[in-house]
Amino acid sequence: MPAKDKRKDKRKDKRKGKNKGKEPKKIIKSDEPAIERAKANASLWEARLEVTELSRIEYRDTSRRLAKNNEDLKKQQYNMEKDIMSVLSYLKKQDQEKDNMIEKLKQQLAKTKEKAQEEKEKLEQKYALQVSELEGQFHQKAKEIGMIQTELKTIKQFQKRKIQVEKELDDLKENLRNSEKNYQETLRRLESRFFEEKHRLEQEAEKRIIMLAERAHHEAVVQLNTAGRNVFKENVYLHKALAYHLKEAEILQQNSKKIEENHSCLLQQKEINDLLVKEKIMQLTQQKSQIQTLQKKVVSLENALTYMTTEFEAEVLKLQQKAIIENQAGLVEIDKLQQLLQMKDREMNRVKRLAKNILDERTEVEQFFLDALYEVKQQILASRKHYKQIAQAAFNLKMRAACAGKTEYPRIRTFDGKEQSTNSVNQDLLEAEKWPTTQKNVDIRDLTWEQKEKVLRLLFAKMNGFAARKYSQSSKPPVPDHIIYGSGEMKETGDENNLLDQTFITQQAPVSDSNRMVSPDVIPQGLQDSDIA
């Protein structure tokens, strides 16, 4: 409604201005009375007064609304920044503690890994030495077992040879017995033959002697003359027979001597064989005792080898179990560290989301302030345009009245904004930016739009922790207490462009002064409509 009233008033003022440009001629021509001019002037000033009152009321309402919004936003911003700072400090503290804990855990893990590696190397060296010693012992025992096996082979060969020798001895004994038996039989047979022959020869000799005696007796009886000759012949024959028998007896004696010699040789061989048998029996008993001792030694060595192998396998199993337990413990520690890292990642992601939400909320607040600043600039432009129109209309009225001869001519005013002008409307507009009073408690509804813009800029600077822009001594504004967040003076700086470029942290929006405009494309249409309404 106030905007429509403004437009209607503007149209009326334009029509009145046009009509009033023509009225002086009519007044000069028609010579109307001064009362009508006074009424017209009064109605004009009443209209101007109404317009200014309406605009003042509208500006006051808008300034009150903006002050209230600014106050609420200031409180929200303060609480939000306080919460953000506390949350961020707490999160940073937690992050630092967790980083320290992670670093300690990493160092502890590295130390445990190094310690486990050293213990593993020591155990490997220790058990490598034990394995090498056991392998040396094993090789030594294997050599001893090989020697024992070779001895066993020789013993087996000796047993085989023994069996053969025993068989040979048995054969020799059998042959000796058979030869002795044959010798005894041949000796007995020869003796029997000798005695038989001797007996036969004796019998034959007796028979012949008897026969010869009888024959000789008969022949002697028959032929005594030829008796001597026959006896001689018979004697010669007997001598020959006796020599033959003696020769046979010698041969038989020689044969008996040979048989006796053979018998003595056989007896000697028998004795030698008995001695060899006894010696072999002694060797066999010694070898049997050696075999028994070697077998006992082999059994003891096998038992020792089995015991050492079982002990070595038990040590290997213990080492494997210990290594498995250590690996499981290391895996458990690694799982714990991974879970801790995952928790850390989740917390970091949560912190990132929280920071993103905080930044989004901050950008929303900053966007709201940008919208407010843009609205203030639009209001500044509209109010300046409206002021220029009113000032130009008033100047035209004064000029018409002066042309009519009612008043003096006013000072010449320019409305194009040239720098050479001494009485320009822009000077009045620049005066609106100054602070006319220096009181402490100032209501924001009583401020002009230019002063409100400066307040917003100071609010942005305080919000983002930047120094306020440098003011001249004449135009330095005493900012009200209910607008400033902290106590103390603002730091002055001469670089206005840096302040304008660094108005926001999260978005570098180019906020210009009254000559530079913020692009309305950045501002949502709903916010523009709500702020303008």
UniProtKB/Swiss-Prot annotation:
The keyword Transmembrane does not apply. Keywords: Cell projection, Cilium, Coiled coil, Cytoplasm, Cytoskeleton, Flagellum. GO terms for biological process: cilium movement involved in cell motility; flagellated sperm motility; motile cilium assembly; negative regulation of microtubule depolymerization; protein stabilization; single fertilization; sperm axoneme assembly. Residues 34-207, 246-368 form a coiled coil. Residues 277-533 are annotated as: Interaction with MNS1 and ODF2. GO terms for cellular component: axoneme; ciliary basal body; sperm flagellum. Disulfide bonds: none annotated. InterPro entries: DUF4515 (IPR032777). Residues 20-30 have a biased composition (Basic and acidic residues). Residues 1-30, 507-533 are annotated as: Disordered. Residues 507-517 have a biased composition (Polar residues). Expressed exclusively in the testis and predominantly expressed in male germ cells. Pfam families: DUF4515. It is found in: Cytoplasm, Cytoskeleton, Cilium basal body; Cytoplasm, Cytoskeleton, Flagellum axoneme. It comes from the Eukaryota. Disruption phenotype: Mice show reduced sperm motility and male subfertility without obvious sperm morphological defects. Abnormalities in sperm flagellar axoneme seen, with an absence of one to three microtubule doublets in the principal piece and end piece of the sperm flagellum. Motile cilia are normally distributed on the epithelial cells of the trachea and the axonemal structure of cilia is intact. Belongs to the BBOF1 family. Interacts with MNS1 and ODF2. PANTHER family: BASAL BODY-ORIENTATION FACTOR 1, COILED-COIL DOMAIN-CONTAINING 166. Plays an essential role in sperm motility and male fertility by stabilizing the sperm flagellar axonemal structure. May be required for the stability of ODF2 and MANS1 proteins. Dispensable for the assembly and function of motile cilia. This is Basal body-orientation factor 1. The lineage of its organism: Eukaryota, Metazoa, Chordata, Craniata, Vertebrata.
